[in-house]
Amino acid sequence: MSRRRVLAGAASVALLPVAVHPARATPESMAAAIREAVGGAEVRPGRVQLEAPSLAENGNSVQITVSVESPMTGADHVKTIHVFSEKNPITTVARFHLGPRAGRAKVSTSIRLATTQRIVAIAAMSDGSCWSGAADVVVTLPACVESGF
């Protein structure tokens, strides 16, 4: 294979269309993800407390705790807790499935945040209602950075 042919091939590869992925989600894409997760049900504020640091020095590990006011009985319990981020490359951060045997509706985890943003937690209840809570987190050292985009 000649050098000329290799260079021509490399140039043609550079001209191929590249799939473009958004570097981060948007508030609109987060709203769409929430609608999809709750099946179009109305999401009301309240009953959900999202604890997160107001300032996170490192976006690679941000500790959050979500608790929901619920008696956690067979008739009235949290079925699912969804966590969404406004500006991460992927909007849905976490999903927890609970039942009455969980005892209490409280989950904790560490998440990665790409930048300063709002985090929203949605609790889907056994009666079909959905409740929300939110927290704003300022990130000084971002995570979730995808090179090449």
Predicted stretch roles:
Residues 126-132:
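Short acidic/polar inter-strand loop motif in beta-rich domains
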Residues 1-17:
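N-terminal secretory signal peptides and thylakoid transit peptides that target proteins
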Residues 89-112:
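An anionic, turn-rich surface loop/hairpin at beta-sheet edges
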